[in-house]
C-alpha cells in the first residue's frame, strides 16, 4: 500500500516521502496516529499544497524537543529513595515509570516511553546513567542516584 508520510518515521522515511508499506501497518498504525495518509491522487495534491505548513509544524516540534532535552540535561542528577538490603540490592526495582515520575517531580515533563534503559531496570543503589529519547532525533542523558530509604 502506497502512503505519504506526514511525519518522520524511524526506519521508513521522513516528511513527504511516498513509501510502500503493508496494508495492516498503514491501516492500524500509521494512519490512526496521523503519521501517514494513503497516496491517492487527491491526497498527493492536498499534501503538496500543505507541505510548507507541515514542515514548519515539524520544525516547531523538533525545537520543543530540543528545549526539553536541554532541560533534562540541565537537571544533572535526580535522586530516588528506595528500600534496600545490606549490600545495596533493592527490594524490587526502579523502572521507567519511577524515573519518569522523579524527573517530572523535578520540573521537566517526561513520559515513561521516553526513558531508555538498555541494561534493564535498576536493582542496586548508587549512580546510574539513564538515556532519554525525547524525539526520534533528540536524545538526553541524566544521572539517577538511587539511595536507601
UniProtKB/Swiss-Prot annotation:
Entry GO terms, CC: ribonucleoprotein complex; ribosome
Family the UniProt entry places it in: Belongs to the bacterial ribosomal protein bL9 family.
GO terms for biological process, alphabetical: translation
Biological role stated in the UniProt entry: Binds to the 23S rRNA.
Pfam families according to UniProt: Ribosomal_L9_C, Ribosomal_L9_N
Record gene name: rplI
Highest taxon, organism lineage: Bacteria
Protein source organism: Enterobacter sp. (strain 638)
Protein name: Large ribosomal subunit protein bL9
Keywords noted in UniProt: Ribonucleoprotein, Ribosomal protein, RNA-binding, rRNA-binding
InterPro entries xrefs: Ribosomal_bL9 (IPR000244), Ribosomal_bL9/RNase_H1_N (IPR009027), Ribosomal_bL9_bac/chp (IPR020594), Ribosomal_bL9_C (IPR020069), Ribosomal_bL9_C_sf (IPR036791), Ribosomal_bL9_N (IPR020070), Ribosomal_bL9_N_sf (IPR036935)
Signal peptide start and end residues: none
GO molecular function: rRNA binding; structural constituent of ribosome
Residues passing through the membrane, by range: none
Amino acid at each position: 500500500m502506497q502512503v505519504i508520510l506526514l511525519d518522520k518515521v524511524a526506519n521508513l522515511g521522513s516528511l513527504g516521502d511516498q513509501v510502500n508499506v503493508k496494508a495492516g501497518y498503514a491501516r492500524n498504525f500509521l494512519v490512526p496516529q496521523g503519521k501517514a495518509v494513503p497516496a491517492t491522487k487527491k491526497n498527493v495534491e492536498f499534501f503538496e499544497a500543505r507541505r510548507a505548513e507541515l514542515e514548519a509544524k515539524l520544525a516547531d516540534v523538533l525545537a520543543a524537543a530540543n528545549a526539553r532535552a536541554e532541560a533534562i540535561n540541565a537537571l544533572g542528577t535526580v535522586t530516588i529513595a528506595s528500600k534496600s538490603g545490606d549490600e545495596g540490592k533493592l527490594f524490587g526495582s526502579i523502572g521507567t515509570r519511577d524515573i519518569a515520575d522523579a524527573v517530572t517531580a523535578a520540573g521537566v515533563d517526561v513520559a515513561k516511553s521516553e526513558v531508555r534503559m538498555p541494561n534493564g531496570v535498576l536493582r542496586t543503589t548508587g549512580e546510574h546513567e539513564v538515556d532519554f529519547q525525547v524525539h526520534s532525533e533528540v536524545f538526553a542523558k541524566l544521572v539517577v542516584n538511587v539511595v536507601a530509604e
